[in-house]
Design a protein with these regions (language model features):
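Conserved donor-binding/catalytic core segment of Leloir-type glycosyltransferases
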Residues: 87-104, 110-113, 128
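Acidic donor-binding loop of glycosyltransferase active sites
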Residues: 167-183, 196
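Donor nucleotide-sugar binding/catalytic pocket of nucleotide-sugar-dependent glycosyltransferases
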Residues: 36-75
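Nucleotide-activated donor-binding/catalytic signature segment of Leloir-type glycosyltransferases, i.e.
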Residues: 140-163
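Conserved acidic donor-binding segment of nucleotide-sugar-dependent glycosyltransferases
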Residues: 212-224, 232-238
Length: 278
């Protein structure tokens, strides 16, 4: 970026995260060095905007939420998706999806599932855990056995191909994101594309993306709170209502809208010299 700017090129960065999920040496120095080479920013959540302003107060920035991830194909009929995955279509499936990393709170969801089992609320239900372990596989296995819920899970702890993404989200009745912290999540945008209601924790940008009581529920990063919202979703029969709302709310997450936001930012910095404030 710095070399490009010497030739008069203005630079724009799309910010997913400013501060890494897992801290490493020199993070702040490297982040400051990179941000110093950029003329404008497109950020995808207010949490990222707040983090950006820790490093630069005045450079232009515009908000544009992550568009729906629509590259996995169209939703499949639920029965077809279940058959392809070897799942019983008579059951209800709650799903945790994505890389299994400590900050994503899978342990909280497993504890919540254990609570629901003890309360006798898992009849006809399974929890799908789909994704590769980033770390701690043995620890999660021990937790699952201690809770006595192995028979209540569908474990797909492996790389998930693009084709299986469509099948999983077409089979799922509810996606849960029990994150301890986050900026935003691509999982949310996949759920929007496949019209799947969500339970998310109100951390980072997740609260901005999932209107509480409209397309899902927003709760605390706490096992009992997560269990309560999962139970509420099924007990109150919210699936049809939330799916209908998703079709309306997801219009905020189009690629055309993001392109427009990039263009508006470009118009603000066009005609300036690289590094010049406007």
């Amino acid at each position: 970026c710095r070399i490009a700017r010497r030739g008069g090129v203005r630079t724009i960065a799309l910010l997913d995260n400013v501060i890494p999920h897992e801290k490493r040496p020199f993070d702040k120095w490297l982040t400051r060095y990179f941000l110093g080479s950029i003329d404008g920013f497109v950020y995808m959540s207010e949490q990222v905007h707040s983090d950006l302003r820790l490093f630069t107060k005045t450079k232009p920035a515009v908000f544009s939420p992550h568009p729906m991830l629509d590259g996995y194909g169209e939703p499949l009929p639920r029965g077809e998706a279940c058959a392809a995955l070897g799942l019983d279509p008579a059951l209800r499936y709650t799903m945790f999806f994505g890389y299994i990393r400590d900050y994503k709170g899978l342990d909280l969801l497993l504890d919540a599932w254990g609570m629901l089992k003890r309360e006798g609320k898992l009849e006809g239900h399974k929890l799908i855990v789909a994704g590769e372990y980033y770390s701690g596989k043995e620890r999660y296995a021990e937790q699952i056995d201690a809770l006595g819920i192995r028979g209540d899970l569908v474990l797909m702890d492996r790389y998930i191909s693009d084709g299986d993404v469509a099948k999983l989200f077409s089979a799922a009745d509810l996606v849960v994101q029990p994150y301890r912290h986050a900026t935003q999540s691509g999982v949310t945008q996949i759920a929007y594309w496949f019209d799947v209601p969500m339970v998310v924790t109100g951390v980072g940008g997740l609260r901005e993306l999932v209107p509480d009581g409209k397309v899902g529920y927003v709760t605390e990063p706490d096992a009992a709170a997560i269990a309560a919202e999962i139970d509420r979703f099924y007990r109150e029969g919210k699936a049809a209502e939330f799916r209908a709302n998703i079709l309306r709310f997801r219009e905020r997450f189009t690629w055309e809208r993001m392109i427009g936001n990039f263009r508006s930012l470009y118009d603000r910095i066009a005609g300036t010299q690289p590094g010049q404030k406007r």
